[in-house]
Amino acid sequence: MTRRTTDQTDRTDQTDRTNPTGRTDQPPRPSAAAKPVRWAAEAVAAAPDAVRPHLDHSAPSLWRVDRMIEELRREGPPYNAVANVLRGLGSYAGEVIVRQTGAEWWGSAGDHWVRTPDGRLWEPLDEARRCFGGHGSLRLLCRDATRGKR
């Protein structure tokens, strides 16, 4: 009989959590979600009238978010001019992942991630910045996060 081992993502040990930069985080607290949830709500409120009804926190709604970011990029504004918009749209994508998978927001030193139940960390705010640079997709990030560990 062989002994089953678990990898790091299967552990529920609260003392051995590190973020993507290698720093140890405290166990998640509900307050870690406060800012991203607010940023997501602000992004939905600021969305064009034709788009707002479609931002229903469903995975398909992220297609529209990707298109919004693509349109921003085509307009050519400097990053600093759209940084808060991108933060809000990334937070919206994170909220979609949270609602679809039962994930939790994690935060440390001003950075925010989503931790899915399988233990993986996702960076939707960074993915929104990559989308603006032409190298990412919030829709695909959500697809990968909701598929679970393979």
Protein language model regions, located:
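Intrinsic-disorder-associated interaction segments
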Residues: 29, 33, 37, 54, ...
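Long, intrinsically disordered low-complexity tandem-repeat segments
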Residues: 6-24
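Amphipathic, interaction-prone secondary-structure segments
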Residues: 76-119
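Acidic, serine/threonine-rich, charge-biased low-complexity segments
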Residues: 1-7, 48-52, 71, 139, ...
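A recognition module on extended beta-rich or small alphabeta surfaces enriched in W/G with H and D/E
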Residues: 114-150
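Exposed alpha-helical structural elements
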Residues: 35, 39-42, 60, 64-67, ...
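An N-terminal amphipathic alpha-helical segment
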Residues: 46-74
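N-terminal intrinsically disordered, low-complexity segments enriched in P/E/S/T
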Residues: 3, 21-54
